[in-house]
Amino acid sequence: MMSDLHIGETINRSLVHKYVAMANEQKADMAVLVGDIMDYESRIAVNQKVEEELRQIHAPLGTYIVLGNHEYRANINAKHKWLLQTGGTLLIDSVAMPDSTFYLVGRDDLVNKKRKPLHSLTKDLDPDLPVIVLDHQPLAFNEMVMNKADLGLHGHTHNGQFWPYPLIMKLIFECPYGYYKKGDTQFYVSSGIGCAGPPYRVGTVSELVVLHITFR
């Protein structure tokens, strides 16, 4: 799981190459990119052909991508077109079955006020199969619990990125970072692998998340 790459002025092709190498070392069954793949514009990703690096992610069940709020900042259509060239499956309010044992629901970002309610995406799914939801911003926990999602994967917060912002994140988000459980739904909010703005962190860490998931 990677979120918040923020490919742009500071997160360039050489860094993405390192991220992909790290991901491949994990030998994961599935890869998910949980929003804010790009920073403010698509120019650098396009000019440096960063999609060629992302196409090197090796995961037998595939790579799945959802949008973040930064995908809605400038050049929206160009960003969507570029994401389709990365070799991953772009899920925008849609459902995939990486194999026959579970569903993967990819939500549009909350920035889009017309995004579909979760119920409309899950109402026709087999209730006996687990449901994993990819949703960039960790702000719809109650909706996920009500709709009996099993696992939610999120990014967006960077866990504040700079001290003392982690304290502020705790005031804004029910869970700004890490593992959380509410009702029968489990969540993981990543601090992100990249950086927004200045290319450094103070008091927080960048992360590539490896999850071991067992269905009962």
Question: What residues fall within each predicted segment?
Answer:
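Soluble catalytic domains of enzymes that build or remodel membrane lipids, polysaccharides, and related
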Residues: 1-216
